[in-house]
Amino acid sequence: MAAGKRDYYEVLGVSRSATAQDIKRAFRKLAMQYHPDRHKGEGETVQKQNEEKFKEVNEAYEVLSDTEKRGMYDRFGHEGLNASGFHETGFNPFDIFNSVFGEGFSFDMDGGSPFDFIFSRGKKSRQNRVVLPYDLEIAVGVDISFFEMTNGCTRTIEYTKRVTCSACDGFGAEGGETGMVSCNSCEGNGFILKNQRSIFGTVQSQMLCQSCGGQGKQAKHKCKTCKGSKYKKVPTTKEIQIPAGIYHGDALVDDHGGNEFGGHVGKLVVHVGVLPSKIFKRVDHNVVANVLVDPMIAITGGKIELPTLEGIKEFNLRAGTKSGEQIVIPGGGIKFTKNFRKKAGDLIIIISYARPSEYSAPELRKLKEFIKPNQEVKQYLNALKNEYKS
């Protein structure tokens, strides 16, 4: 192996059996990671390290992406490439980068949108590149009640999405592609040269032309249908299934429900809000409710009415039920769908004593006949007295 040269497969992080697609995918990731424009202002040492990495990655890709060069490298290694004169001829890493990403590519987003995305129409040429005029993803919100959350529900949502203008095929020009002329701003190049000062002196970089979006062309006359916007708005109705047990703030995603442009389709993201209940509270997959009962019924036992997710139901409260005591009804909680869990949660009822009813004097005298010392109160008073003695 040539002195100082790393194995090209190791450089790209792929195996020797990697396909051309695997190699290109690895190159795109590493080239973006080490591109000098991404490390401006990080210090001379860091910039130098990334420049060397960038050159190394591009060199490895130039060899492994070429069937003939890769075959020679696999058989004879770096020495074989040296014999063929590859290492002596030199190369420009930016030429390789631009051949993959396009000549108009730039990390400079001045005046651009964070949603700008370049794709090709047919051949990968500068004239065919198109910048998406809008984000493809659509986000909407929908609120459901606590009861709907516990059992799951169906919601119909209405929203407006954008689709490619069929009159101009997304070019924004009258007559479509035939109505496009050379861009005045970039003179048909698709990019604008920009001089920037750096520690190495004045560096010239390419910036995507914002006037034509990197196409090198612009509309001679705007499309009469879309007024040059390249799209039309379409009112859309969609029915969505909201599973039981969904949490407040969770999102449901339809991979093909978003905006469309030039054959690309975005996602529809539905953010679900769960309205709070005045009765119930969620604790994981269980449902908790505080229930007021008459102290006399709690003492003597009897029928009370309990709130459940299916409605109000009668329940026989045993005699001597204490305030704060819990009644657990298995399976009475959230009924998760198969997408979450198969077992339903529990309904937990917490008993609280209501204010005692008002009784007449004769009734109170009669009730006093049944009063006997309360052992819990007696223990509390003894502890209180001991506290004062200490």
Curated annotation (Swiss-Prot):
Its main location: cytoplasm. Coiled coil: none annotated. Keywords: Chaperone, Cytoplasm, DNA replication, Metal-binding, Repeat, Stress response, Zinc, Zinc-finger. Binds 2 Zn(2+) ions per monomer. Transmembrane segments: none annotated. GO terms for cellular component: cytoplasm. Zn(2+) 2 binds at C183, C186, C209, C212. GO terms for biological process: chaperone cofactor-dependent protein refolding; DNA replication; protein refolding; response to heat. A zinc finger (CR-type) spans 152-235. It holds the Pfam family DnaJ_C. Residues 5-79 form the J domain. The keyword Zinc-finger applies. Its cofactor is Zn(2+). It is found in: Cytoplasm. CXXCXGXG motif repeats lie at residues 165-172, 183-190, 209-216, 223-230. One of its GO terms (molecular function) is heat shock protein binding. Zn(2+) 1 binds at C165, C168, C223, C226. Homodimer. The J domain is necessary and sufficient to stimulate DnaK ATPase activity. Zinc center 1 plays an important role in the autonomous, DnaK-independent chaperone activity of DnaJ. Zinc center 2 is essential for interaction with DnaK and for DnaJ activity. Belongs to the DnaJ family. HAMAP family: DnaJ (MF_01152). Participates actively in the response to hyperosmotic and heat shock by preventing the aggregation of stress-denatured proteins and by disaggregating proteins, also in an autonomous, DnaK-independent fashion. Unfolded proteins bind initially to DnaJ; upon interaction with the DnaJ-bound protein, DnaK hydrolyzes its bound ATP, resulting in the formation of a stable complex. GrpE releases ADP from DnaK; ATP binding to DnaK triggers the release of the substrate protein, thus completing the reaction cycle. This is Chaperone protein DnaJ. It comes from Mycoplasma pneumoniae (strain ATCC 29342 / M129 / Subtype 1).
